């Protein structure tokens, strides 16, 4: 499994919001951080992806474009929980929508 190196910052940003909203206890967040660091994800520097991210800017956020650009570069299927991302024009990699998305009621 591979992801742009920004994956960790995105996860922490979500957890910060949950913690500030009282939906994630500090102890659980600390344990989750250790779990995140232990996940065997190949974290790929996004610098080489910037050109493709910019090309995708009209249809995707730059953050989403980084994941798409990486999947394209690795010639693999991208896994997401975001149906809108999967339906957006521009990506050339296959995109599969996970059915395990519990936080987005708008995703089937």
Which role fits each region the language model picked out?
Residues 10-17, 32-35, 52:
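A general alpha-helix detector
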Residues 39-81:
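Active-site neighborhoods of divalent-metal-dependent phosphate/nucleic-acid chemistry enzymes
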Residues 1-20, 42-46:
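PIN/NYN-family metal-dependent endoribonuclease catalytic core
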Residues 4, 68-108:
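Acidic, PIN/NYN-like endoribonuclease modules and their adjacent C-terminal/linker elements
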Residues 12, 36, 54, 88-90, ...:
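Short secondary-structure boundary/hinge segments and terminal tails
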